[in-house]
């Protein structure tokens, strides 16, 4: 059955691709317009927004292929530069939730005298991280940072698109301060107000998260409140590319 499905998909794909591009685009547009013409405009919008989610999934999948396994957003948004710019050579840096290791690799290459360790509980992603071209000052560890971290003390902790996956974010940040003894926390999270469609999605009851595992996508005020509640102080913060990038420091009065 699976083999038949693949053959059928290849046949349909061939027929589709030999059609002129303008015809394909017109057909797709027409189908989306028809799908949106619900008696209730809100229901029509719901359908379109869910279609957009599927399209975004396909775009991201193709973007990964285009980038030979690494999403072009790393290169185009240059958010790695934020982490590098706020660190110094010689620091011990722990990248929590390192994924494929792209950020940790950039930091380790930029600062050869630093010890950089990435920790993640996803074995598949860690396997890819370990087989990449890594500098000698970079290592990867399998583990759940909500339970334990590699022995410190650490100078800086990187949390790139991690906090939004945690339920008790304040408790997690407090625990990290105790387990790592780091004074610097470089944090990147998605911003709820990145598009006008986010509050519209919430109003319509359509999922507005960029990842179904996200427990929150912060407003600016929510982010600042959680950082303050954890005992950290925001040293610098900026919003770029629909995200919050922050350099936070441990407040010794709350240690």
Language model regions located:
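A short acidic, glycine-rich active-site loop
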Residues: 208-215
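Conserved class I S-adenosyl-L-methionine
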Residues: 186-208
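Activation segment
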Residues: 149, 166-170, 196, 212, ...
């Amino acid at each position: 059955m699976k083999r038949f499905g693949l053959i059928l998909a290849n046949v349909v794909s061939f027929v589709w691709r030999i059609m002129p591009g303008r015809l394909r685009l017109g057909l797709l547009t027409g189908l989306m317009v028809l799908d949106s013409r619900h008696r209730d405009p809100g229901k029509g919008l719901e359908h379109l927004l869910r279609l957009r989610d599927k399209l975004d999934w396909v775009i991201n999948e193709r973007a990964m292929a285009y980038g030979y396994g690494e999403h072009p957003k790393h290169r185009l948004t240059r958010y790695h530069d934020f982490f590098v710019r706020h660190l110094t050579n010689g620091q011990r840096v722990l990248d929590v939730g390192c994924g494929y290791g792209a950020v940790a690799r950039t930091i380790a290459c930029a600062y050869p005298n630093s010890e950089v360790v990435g920790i993640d509980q996803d074995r598949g992603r860690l396997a890819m991280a370990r087989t990449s071209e890594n500098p000698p000052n970079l290592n990867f560890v399998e583990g759940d940072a909500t339970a334990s971290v590699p022995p410190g003390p650490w100078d800086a902790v990187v949390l790139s698109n991690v906090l939004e996956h945690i339920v008790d974010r304040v408790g997690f940040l407090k625990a990290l301060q105790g387990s790592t003894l780091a004074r610097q926390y470089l944090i990147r999270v998605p911003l709820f107000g990145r598009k006008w469609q986010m509050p519209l999605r919430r109003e319509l009851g359509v999922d507005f998260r960029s990842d179904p595992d996200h427990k929150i996508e912060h407003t600016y005020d929510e982010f600042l409140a959680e950082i303050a509640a954890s005992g950290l102080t925001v040293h610098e913060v900026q919003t770029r590319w629909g995200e919050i990038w922050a350099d936070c420091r441990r407040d010794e009065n709350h240690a």
